[in-house]
């Protein structure tokens, strides 16, 4: 992996792939210099205790661009003020409206000043213990161009790593090339059944107070709660990788952990 990453990093730094977010220069336009194209930034390491220390891909080279990726796929977890349905009594995106947005804002400034956030560089300098790349630490990967999407999949595969990521854009025709790579992010068990029927593996948001470890969808598909949530002291995404959509598996359930979860729990205690 190290030899390949060094070779690929050298190529990325020498070649200007116009319009592709995987270059060192992060070109913003297509070869015709007309259509703005969604970019992405890649980091080698992570302090996220749930995922483990793995390379990560952040969608958007600006905060506005990242939020736009969520608007483009119609993500309901985006705050109402930003064009989604989140906030109030509805679930709210942890990444775009929690602490990850601050880290992303810092990265955007560094990228504008020339810091190398290419995927090859992230893989080259990633931990040797990393077994996966997290695709979509913020933003939605389905908003990326087909060319960038193919590059990401091929680069991760050639590095011998698993790809783990999610998209709310699974119902879009333009996201079909991500089937078998990304998990379909679903908001209900019924949606999970729909995603599976269309060839996706599914992940689903569960109520914030969900306690059961295993349930079934209306169509009878098994749903298990994310092992890294159940046993955070011993399980990380890096050593679990059940969300590698290239491998058959159950629906993965995630109890709501958005910014409003603490308030909901407090309200629940008050009403008891």
Predicted region positions:
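Class I S-adenosyl-L-methionine
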Residues: 29-272
């Amino acid at each position: 992996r190290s030899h390949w990453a060094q070779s690929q990093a050298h190529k990325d730094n020498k070649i200007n792939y116009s319009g592709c977010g995987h270059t060192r220069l992060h070109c913003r336009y297509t070869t015709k210099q007309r259509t703005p194209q969604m970019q992405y930034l890649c980091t080698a390491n992570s302090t996220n205790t749930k995922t483990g220390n793995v390379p990560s891909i952040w969608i958007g080279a600006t905060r506005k661009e990242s939020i736009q990726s969520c608007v483009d796929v119609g993500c309901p977890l985006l705050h109402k003020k930003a064009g989604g349905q989140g906030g109030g009594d509805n679930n709210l995106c942890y990444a775009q409206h929690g602490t990850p947005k601050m880290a992303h804002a810092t990265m955007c400034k560094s990228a504008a000043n020339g810091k190398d956030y290419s995927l090859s560089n992230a893989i080259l300098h990633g931990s040797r213990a990393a077994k996966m790349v997290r695709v979509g630490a913020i933003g939605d990967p389905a908003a990326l161009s087909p060319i960038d999407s193919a590059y990401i999949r091929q680069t991760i595969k050639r590095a011998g790593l698993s790809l783990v990521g999610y998209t709310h854009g699974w119902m879009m025709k333009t996201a079909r090339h991500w089937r078998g790579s990304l998990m379909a992010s679903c908001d209900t068990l019924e949606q999970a059944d729909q995603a599976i029927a269309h060839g996706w593996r599914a992940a689903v948001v569960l109520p914030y107070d969900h306690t059961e470890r295993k349930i079934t969808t209306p169509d009878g598909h098994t749903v298990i709660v994310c092992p890294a949530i159940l046993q955070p002291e011993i399980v990380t995404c890096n050593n679990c990788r059940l969300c590698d959509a290239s491998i058959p598996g159950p629906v993965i359930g995630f109890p709501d952990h958005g910014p409003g979860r603490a308030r909901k729990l407090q309200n629940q205690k008050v009403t008891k």
